[in-house]
């Protein structure tokens, strides 16, 4: 079992398999030109899996594959299969923009993937183009249909942006509701890579919009989950992830691994240690030591809690998966 200095059990690993993304979303990608990491600097699936085995053997029970956009990395399903074959009851999930999901969903399902979180910020083509800087909505919707048809457990994530998609919250909720999938509205997390004129909505503002049509009550919150759950009168449940108002640091159970091998204790801290050298030397004990050191050094609180006046992250979310 992995336990940090504050008694939190760390049993959730998020793996960013690539920095690359086929979208250029305003709230995530830098406006200025930048370069991707060279391929040789990235850990191979075999190298990532070597570390995954270390984590599972030490008590990790949940793994989420993220990016960038994870489906742009070739043969992702093979990595999924490695993990699910090693530990069949592992809670294994994927976060994706769904644009490439129609072509890959069947292979992912056969590899053992059961749960998918899909970023869905709008149902309007022009808004989707504005956000992603390309025509993507048709591919996203086709990917969603394919995932649901194959029986995946699907959740939707919507970043709440003032003046961009706030008029669609009820439509998005109903889109998810009809498909028997949960939607979570996420407060915009300010970061230095987002376009500077973006403004988010706080949880109270999101709830006020939904209350224009629906009555709801607050449900119970899972101790390790970031979302506060609300229930409509007909029993449908949706979530709000509100890091501005309610951090979940006290129950945080996660660490993050970048595609380059950086093990990151907190999304809002720049501190990280690399497992690359140990893994490429096949030094399993060394990799395990890095894991335990990162967990030991995990902060009690994120920097938002320490400095409300400067609520921006310097870390690129496309490198760590948010």
Curated annotation (Swiss-Prot):
Q: Name one GO biological process term.
A: Mo-molybdopterin cofactor biosynthetic process
**Mind telling me which Pfam families this protein's record contains?**
Fer4_12 (PF13353), Mob_synth_C (PF06463), Radical_SAM (PF04055)
The record places domain Radical SAM core at 5-217
Cofactor comment: Binds 2 [4Fe-4S] clusters. Binds 1 [4Fe-4S] cluster coordinated with 3 cysteines and an exchangeable S-adenosyl-L-methionine and 1 [4Fe-4S] cluster coordinated with 3 cysteines and the GTP-derived substrate.
Which keywords, in A-to-Z order, does the entry hold?
4Fe-4S, GTP-binding, Iron, Iron-sulfur, Lyase, Metal-binding, Molybdenum cofactor biosynthesis, Nucleotide-binding, S-adenosyl-L-methionine
Binding of S-adenosyl-L-methionine occurs at 27, 68, 119, 189
What is this enzyme's class at the first EC digit?
lyase
The Swiss-Prot or TrEMBL record annotates one GO molecular function as: 4 iron, 4 sulfur cluster binding
Residues that bind [4Fe-4S] cluster 2: 249, 252, 266
Q: Which residues bind GTP?
A: 14, 64, 95, 155, 254-256
InterPro entries reported in the protein's UniProt record: Aldolase_TIM (IPR013785), Elp3/MiaA/NifB-like_rSAM (IPR006638), MoaA (IPR013483), MoaA_NifB_PqqE_Fe-S-bd_CS (IPR000385), MoaA_twitch (IPR010505), MoCo_biosynth_MoaA/MoaC (IPR050105), rSAM (IPR007197)
Instruction: Tell me the cofactors it needs.
Output: [4Fe-4S] cluster
Record's PROSITE patterns? MOAA_NIFB_PQQE, RADICAL_SAM
Residues bound to [4Fe-4S] cluster 1 are: 21, 25, 28
What pathway, per the record? Cofactor biosynthesis; molybdopterin biosynthesis
The record's catalysed reaction(s) read: GTP + AH2 + S-adenosyl-L-methionine = (8S)-3',8-cyclo-7,8-dihydroguanosine 5'-triphosphate + 5'-deoxyadenosine + L-methionine + A + H(+)
This entry's Enzyme Commission designation comes to 4.1.99.22
SMART domains in alphabetical order:
Elp3
Task: Give the UniProt family note.
Answer: Belongs to the radical SAM superfamily. MoaA family.
State how it assembles: Monomer and homodimer.
Tell me, what does this protein do in biology? Catalyzes the cyclization of GTP to (8S)-3',8-cyclo-7,8-dihydroguanosine 5'-triphosphate.
This chain belongs to the protein called GTP 3',8-cyclase
């Amino acid at each position: 079992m992995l336990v940090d200095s504050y008694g939190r059990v760390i049993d959730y690993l998020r793996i960013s398999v690539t920095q690359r993304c086929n979208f250029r979303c305003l709230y995530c990608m830098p406006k200025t030109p930048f370069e991707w990491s060279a391929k040789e600097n990235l850990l191979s699936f075999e190298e990532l899996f070597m570390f995954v085995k270390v984590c599972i053997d030490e008590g990790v029970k949940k793994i989420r594959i993220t990016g960038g956009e994870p489906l742009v990395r070739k043969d992702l399903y093979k990595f999924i299969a490695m993990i699910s074959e090693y530990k069949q009851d592992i809670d294994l999930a994927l976060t994706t923009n769904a644009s490439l999901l129609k072509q890959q969903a069947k292979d992912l399902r056969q590899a053992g993937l059961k749960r998918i979180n899909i970023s869905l910020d709008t149902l309007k083509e022009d808004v989707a183009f504005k956000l992603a800087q390309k025509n993507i909505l048709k591919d996203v919707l086709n990917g969603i249909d394919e995932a649901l048809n194959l029986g995946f457990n699907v959740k939707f994530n919507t970043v709440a942006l003032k003046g961009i998609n706030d008029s669609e919250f009820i439509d998005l909720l109903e889109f998810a509701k009809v498909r028997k999938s949960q939607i979570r509205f996420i407060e915009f997390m300010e970061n230095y890579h987002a376009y500077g004129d973006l403004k988010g909505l706080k949880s109270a503002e999101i709830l006020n919009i939904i209350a224009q049509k629906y009555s709801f009550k607050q449900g119970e919150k899972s101790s390790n989950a970031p979302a506060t759950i609300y229930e409509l009168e007909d029993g449908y449940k949706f979530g709000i992830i509100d890091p501005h108002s309610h951090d979940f640091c006290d129950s945080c159970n996660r660490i993050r691994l970048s595609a380059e091998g950086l093990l990151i204790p907190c999304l809002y801290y720049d501190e990280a240690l690399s497992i690359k050298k140990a893994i490429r030397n096949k030094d399993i004990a060394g990799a395990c030591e890095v894991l335990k050191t990162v967990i030991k050094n995990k902060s009690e609180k994120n920097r938002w809690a320490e400095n409300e006046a400067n609520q921006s992250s310097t870390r690129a979310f496309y490198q760590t998966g948010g």
